[in-house]
């Protein structure tokens, strides 16, 4: 049983809270039984699994107070696992024409800096579309603790890509807070582009899009939506249309 705070695995878990160490080590950490199970179901192999002594879980036992001390959640943590960062499938990004593209389009994010939003959008994509999530400039690390928790395990089955908007399939549609066409403008889009709630999409991304669409909001309510909520609404529209049309993979 691990009883020393100087144990190398505990020190590694602490380091994995920071992006620079996750990238250097090629690892990220999860906490909780649900995320451990999600990783195993997806076929991922943890580097190691640390469990609170007396929890009855499988793994290397750690004195409970020590395990809590390296947790990003605090007390109550029963299991922490370290995993190799999964490789994204870049073959999902290639030119398409007409209806001859992946059944549901990809989501492209630019400047979405909140890891909770990134993780939630990864989960939404896993639920609604077959194409990848593509992270452009200034997006949060999808393997940060908050993003991993928000993805609810989808980070294993649908790890996002990092690429520029120019790599994504055409035609592209931009989701904008104001001044766009109705959501019907999204119909037929191969890539849905979204930006942060406050800043929106930069001009270079808007220019790469064939259309712009705006989600209609009720008068007197908020003037914009959280980007994760907007992504869910728009992705559901596109996926419903694709299922009705019976699109198939290229």
Predicted feature descriptions by range:
Residues 28-30, 45-53, 160-162, 171-177, ...:
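Short, hydrophobic beta-strand segments that form beta-sheet elements in well-ordered domains
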Residues 2, 28, 110-111, 136-137, ...:
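Glycine- and other small-residue-rich loops at beta-strand/loop junctions that grip anionic moieties
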Residues 174-221:
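Active-site/ligand-binding-proximal alpha/beta "capping" segment
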Residues 86-180:
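RNA substrate-binding interface of SAM-dependent RNA methyltransferases
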Residues 1-79, 96-97, 250:
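N-terminal positively charged helical leader segments and presequences
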Residues 59-62, 102-107, 208-219:
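Glycine/charged-rich beta-loop-alpha catalytic/anionic-binding loops adjacent to active sites
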Residues 54, 64-67, 138-140, 197-199, ...:
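Short, acidic/turn-prone active-site loops that include or flank metal/cofactor-
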Residues 81, 124-128, 139-156, 203, ...:
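Structured adenosyl-cofactor binding patch, chiefly the S-adenosyl-L-methionine
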